């Protein structure tokens, strides 16, 4: 593939994004993403531009009309609050410098793992219980 991403993956400035409709817990989804090679994880979203690309991918993959499958059409990303920690991290270990939390006050209190929301056309995320099974998006090195 000329852009360095495999079939079904979308090139972005930060690597390749892949959407998987299989519904897994956050930790199983992260393990699945790591199989794609060194530096592969559940997607970290570094900027508004990257979030737009990701939202386009998800809306194209899922219809994005509010009728997403699974747990209300949520999609895991790599943001989580590790056990015993008060701060959110990406699954690659980096601190989030960009955020797009859903506007409700409780958006950060629903759990320790973050999922994009179908209701917002995948442009915002909210905390969910990490054991919830959702579709997910991986980011791999190009």
From Swiss-Prot:
Subcellular location, record wording: Secreted, Extracellular space, Extracellular matrix
Record Gene3D superfamilies: Mannose-Binding Protein A, subunit A
Tissues in which the protein is found: Expressed in the shell gland mucosa. Not detected in hen liver, magnum, isthmus, cartilage, bone or in egg white or yolk.
Residues of the C-type lectin domain: 12-139
Disulfide feature: 5-16, 33-138, 113-130
Carbohydrate-modified residues: 59
Keyword Phosphoprotein: yes
Domain of life: Eukaryota
Residues recorded with modification Phosphoserine: 61, 67
Keyword annotations from UniProtKB, A to Z: Disulfide bond, Extracellular matrix, Glycoprotein, Lectin, Phosphoprotein, Secreted
PROSITE patterns: C_TYPE_LECTIN_2
InterPro entries registered for this protein in UniProt: C-type_lectin-like, C-type_lectin-like/link_sf, C-type_lectin/snaclec_domain, CTDL_fold
GO BP term, pick one: biomineral tissue development
GO molecular function, one term: ion binding
Key word Glycoprotein present: yes
CC terms in the record's Gene Ontology section: extracellular matrix; extracellular region; extracellular space; organomineral extracellular matrix
Biological role: May form proteinaceous networks during the construction of the eggshell which then may control the deposition of the mineral phase.
Descriptive protein name: Ovocleidin-17
Protein species of origin: Gallus gallus (Chicken)
Upper classification of the organism: Eukaryota, Metazoa, Chordata, Craniata, Vertebrata
């Amino acid at each position: 593939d000329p852009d360095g991403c495999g079939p079904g993956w979308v090139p972005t400035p930060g690597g390749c994004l892949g959407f998987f409709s299989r519904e897994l817990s956050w930790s199983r989804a992260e393990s699945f993403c790591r199989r794609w090679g060194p530096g592969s994880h559940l997607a970290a979203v570094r900027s508004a531009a990257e979030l737009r690309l990701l939202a386009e991918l998800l809306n194209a993959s899922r219809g994005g009309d509010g009728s997403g499958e699974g747990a209300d059409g949520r999609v895991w990303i790599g943001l989580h609050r590790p056990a015993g920690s008060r701060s959110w991290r990406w699954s690659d270990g980096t601190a989030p410098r960009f955020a797009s939390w859903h506007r409700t006050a409780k958006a950060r209190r629903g759990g320790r793992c973050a999922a994009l929301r179908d209701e917002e056309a995948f442009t915002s995320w909210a905390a969910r219980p990490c054991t919830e099974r959702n579709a997910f998006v991986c980011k791999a090195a190009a």
